Each structure stands twice: as structure tokens, then as C-alpha cells.
């Protein structure tokens, strides 16, 4: 970490915006719905100005017209999220720590799988931590850690320490981004916002309701190396 370049918050936020705009294009294009299935730090390419592009479409999947759902009503307008049609899969693809748990359990792929992965990516960017960490008791997911700190009103402890001393540190903006991440990683895909809704939240064009805290976690990380962190690529 000592020899790694610290990316200031403003640059990290620009990366976030670049990625979500990419997902809006992929998930909500008029030409069809592309689900990337492997949104994670190592699949985000940065140039010298920290502009970001989504890369590695090796396991991406195109949802057919019959399985897509398009609706003008947003999740917040009615209070009840609209249905999200799915494509059934027998083979689960992705990276442990970023795979939508509902996709793993039900084996039905929706574009909300990318939103879940994006939520974990947000937590990576805010915290500088791996998606899965080795601790004395075994493996701890970043998702579990974030929810634990949220429930204990200690969310400030999630923030990447070097960020605090960097120019442009904005605590309220970072915490707002974390709240958006919590909505993206809701266990039920129908509770997650769409990519365009996430973009509006990040742009402060849409309110962020209080996220629902899950009662428990079901993911099995026993076969994961947990080696994919936001800062490891710098």
C-alpha cells in the first residue's frame, strides 16, 4: 500500500460516474439489455486522467426481448418496485464477492445482477478494501462489514483512511454514496434501483430512502481467494 498511488475522492467519484453511465448504456440501451456479470475493480480500466471504462465482456449475456422488462414507473414513485423479468441459467458466472446472491440461489439472471456488483464496487471504492477479507474467524465479506458498521452507527470507520487526509475529502458525499451502495446490494433484486436510477441518485436528482438492512447473509465464500481489491491494481 505504501508504494500505491492514493486516488483522491473527487477522482474516485468520477470513476463511479463513468462506470454507472456505462451500465446505463449496457442495461438500458434501446438495442437490448447486456448484463456484464463481472463488474469488479479489475474489470474497470483507468486512463492517465482516471477516466474509467468497463472491460472484459467474456461472460456477458444479452437478455432477449422476451425476458427484458421496460417500464417508465420508477421504484420510488409507487413504493412497490416493478417486476424484473429474468433469464434462467444453469451455469452461474462471475466473481465470488460480486455475484448477485439471488442469481446464485434462483439461477435467474436479470440486469439487477450488475447493480448488485456495482454496489460492491462502490464499497470497494469508498473503503479501499477487498470484497472478501481473511480474518481470525474465517472469511468476512465487505458487504457484511458495511452492514455491521451501519447497524452500529460506525459507518465512518468504513472509509479508506488515506482519503481523510486528501484534498477534496467530502464526508457527506462519501456517506451518501455508501447509502446508494446499500440499495444496490439489497438481497432481493426487485428492491434494487435500476442503473439510471442509481445515476440520478448520484447526481442528487432522486431521493435516497433509508436502506433495508438484511437479517442474515447466505453467500458461501469458502472457495474464494478474496484477492480483488480496489487499491490492488495501483
Question: Could you tell me what each predicted segment is?
Answer:
Residues 114:
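Conserved catalytic-loop aspartate of Hanks-type protein kinases
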Residues 65-86, 93, 137, 159, ...:
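Intrinsically disordered, low-complexity cytosolic regulatory tails
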Residues 21-34:
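Protein kinase catalytic-loop region centered on the HRD/HxD motif
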Residues 2-17, 167-171:
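Activation segment of protein kinase catalytic domains, centered on the conserved DFG
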Residues 38, 43:
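Conserved catalytic-loop position in the HRD/HxD motif
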Residues 106-111:
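Activation segment
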Amino acid at each position: 500500500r505504501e508504494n500505491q498511488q492514493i486516488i483522491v475522492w473527487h477522482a474516485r467519484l468520477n470513476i463511479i460516474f463513468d462506470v454507472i453511465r456505462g451500465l446505463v448504456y449496457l442495461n438500458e440501451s434501446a438495442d437490448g439489455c447486456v448484463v456484464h456479470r463481472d463488474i469488479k475493480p479489475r474489470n474497470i480500466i483507468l486512463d492517465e486522467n482516471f477516466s474509467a471504462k468497463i472491460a472484459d465482456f467474456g461472460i456477458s449475456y444479452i437478455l432477449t426481448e422476451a425476458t427484458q422488462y421496460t417500464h417508465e414507473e420508477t421504484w420510488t414513485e409507487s413504493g412497490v418496485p416493478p417486476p424484473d423479468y429474468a433469464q434462467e441459467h444453469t451455469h452461474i458466472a462471475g466473481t465470488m464477492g460480486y455475484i448477485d446472491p439471488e442469481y446464485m440461489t434462483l439461477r435467474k439472471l436479470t440486469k439487477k445482477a450488475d447493480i448488485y456488483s456495482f454496489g460492491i464496487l462502490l464499497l470497494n471504492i469508498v473503503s479501499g478494501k477487498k470484497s472478501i477479507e481473511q480474518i481470525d474467524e474465517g472469511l468476512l465479506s465487505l458487504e457484511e462489514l458495511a452492514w455491521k458498521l451501519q447497524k452500529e452507527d460506525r459507518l465512518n470507520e468504513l472509509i479508506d483512511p488515506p482519503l481523510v487526509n486528501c484534498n477534496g475529502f467530502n464526508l457527506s458525499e462519501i456517506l451518501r454514496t455508501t447509502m446508494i451502495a446499500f440499495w444496490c446490494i439489497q438481497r432481493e433484486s426487485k428492491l434494487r434501483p435500476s442503473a439510471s436510477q442509481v445515476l440520478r441518485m448520484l447526481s442528487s436528482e432522486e431521493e435516497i430512502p433509508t436502506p433495508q438492512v438484511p437479517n442474515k447473509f447466505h453467500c458461501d465464500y469458502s472457495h474464494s481467494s478474496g484477492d480483488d481489491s480496489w487499491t490492488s491494481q495501483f
